Amino acid sequence: MEQVVIVDAIRTPMGRSKGGAFRNVRAEDLSAHLMRSLLARNPSLTAATLDDIYWGCVQQTLEQGFNIARNAALLAEIPHSVPAVTVNRLCGSSMQALHDAARMIMTGDAQVCLVGGVEHMGHVPMSHGVDFHPGLSRNVAKAAGMMGLTAEMLSRLHGISREMQDQFAARSHARAWAATQSGAFKTEIIPTGGHDADGVLKQFNYDEVIRPETTVEALSTLRPAFDPVSGTVTAGTSSALSDGAAAMLVMSESRARELGLKPRARIRSMAVVGCDPSIMGYGPVPASKLALKKAGLSASDIDVFEMNEAFAAQILPCIKDLGLMEQIDEKINLNGGAIALGHPLGCSGARISTTLINLMERKDAQFGLATMCIGLGQGIATVFERV
C-alpha cells in the first residue's frame, strides 16, 4: 500500500462573515486562488498530472452550488482533463476530502491530488435552505439539530462551568493573536485579495476575526446565546462566523521523490465515527481513540493536537475524556482555534490540518492529531507523522 504524504498546506486569512474582508469575494475565487497558489509554490508539478481534486463545502447552493470544486478548478485554469468533486460531511467536509484522496492514493488509483475546502458563511449562511424532515423527531431530539443546545447538553453532562468556558475562549484569542504577532501563521497564510472597511481593494495576510482585547471579565458579561434561562454557552465561547478556504497538496511518497518534493508529513491513520446527535460535539473522543488505535499509538504519544473549537463547552469535555486536561497548554490548539479564527464549515478540516503540520514542524514533533466534531453526531480524526 502506498504511503500518503502532505507536500504543502496553505490557507487564506479568515475573514469576518459580517461585512468582512471577503464580503465582495466569492467562495469559488477563494478556492481557485489557493489551487493556483499550491501549483505556483510547487513548480515541479504540472497541473495536468493531477489525478483529482477533492474539495469540502457544506452549503452547496448559490455560489457554492453545482460542484464548487469543479467551478473553482475551471477558474484556476487547471486543465479540463483534471476532474474535481465536492465533498460534504458537514463540519468534517475538507478532512473527509483528505481521507477520500488518501484512500485513492493508498490503493494506487491516484498519485497526486489537490485537497481542500471552503465556506463563505457571509454569502451562504449556515441555515440557508435547511429543512429537516419532521419525522426525524421520532428518533432524534429536535434540539439535536441546534448545535448550541448540543453544546449546552455536553457542558451539563461533563460539569463544564461558565467560567471554564470563558477562560478557554479568552485563551483561544490570546493564542491566535500571539501567533499572528510572532509570524507563526505566515507559513500557512497566502495573501488574499479583499476589501478593507472603506471598500479599498487590498491584500490581506492576517486573520481579521481575532479579538486580541478579549478577556475573561468581558466574556463573563455576555448573555447565554442558546438557552436564555439556564444556559452557559455564549457567542463569545462559540466559534466565530468567518469566511475562508484551505488547501493541501497530497501525493504518494514515491511520486513526491520522483518530483523532488519534500514531504512535510505523512498520514499515519484516519477515522470517522458516529455518536448520539444530542451530544454531537463529543464525536472527537471516539474518532480520536479509533485513529490512535489504527496508528498503534496512545494519546500520550501525540505531541500536538488540533481540535476544532466549535464551542468551549464542546471541546472541554473532549479534552477531559481524552485525558488531556493537564496538558492543554503544552499540546492543544497552541495557536488558538475556531473560537478566535472562526469555523468556515467546509474549510475547517483542511485548516486545522494545515495549522497542525506547521506546528509540528516548529516544535520538531513526531506525531500530531487533528480532530473535529460534526453536526448531527459524527466525529473525524487524522493522525499525522513527520517524515
Curated annotation (Swiss-Prot):
Q: Which Gene3D superfamilies match?
A: 3.40.47.10
What is the annotated role of this protein in its UniProt record? Catalyzes the final step of fatty acid oxidation in which acetyl-CoA is released and the CoA ester of a fatty acid two carbons shorter is formed. Involved in the aerobic and anaerobic degradation of long-chain fatty acids.
Record flagged with keyword Protein transport: no
Which sites are catalytic?
C91 (acyl-thioester intermediate), H343 (proton acceptor), C373 (proton acceptor)
Keywords, alphabetical: Acyltransferase, Cytoplasm, Fatty acid metabolism, Lipid degradation, Lipid metabolism, Transferase
What is the protein's given name? 3-ketoacyl-CoA thiolase
> Could you describe the subunit structure of this protein?
Heterotetramer of two alpha chains (FadB) and two beta chains (FadA).
Pfam families, alphabetized: Thiolase_C, Thiolase_N
Q: Which organism is it from?
A: Salmonella typhimurium (strain LT2 / SGSC1412 / ATCC 700720)
Q: Name one GO cellular component term.
A: cytoplasm
Q: Which residue stretches, if any, does this entry annotate as coiled coil?
A: none
Q: Which family does it belong to?
A: Belongs to the thiolase-like superfamily. Thiolase family.
Cell compartment(s), UniProt: Cytoplasm
Q: Which GO terms describe its biological process?
A: fatty acid beta-oxidation; phenylacetate catabolic process
Principal localization reads: cytoplasm
**Listed EC numbers:** 2.3.1.16
Q: Which GO terms describe its molecular function?
A: acetyl-CoA C-acyltransferase activity
Pathway entry? Lipid metabolism; fatty acid beta-oxidation
Q: Which PANTHER family match?
A: 3-KETOACYL-COA THIOLASE FADA, 3-KETOACYL-COA THIOLASE, PEROXISOMAL
Q: Which reaction does it catalyse?
A: an acyl-CoA + acetyl-CoA = a 3-oxoacyl-CoA + CoA
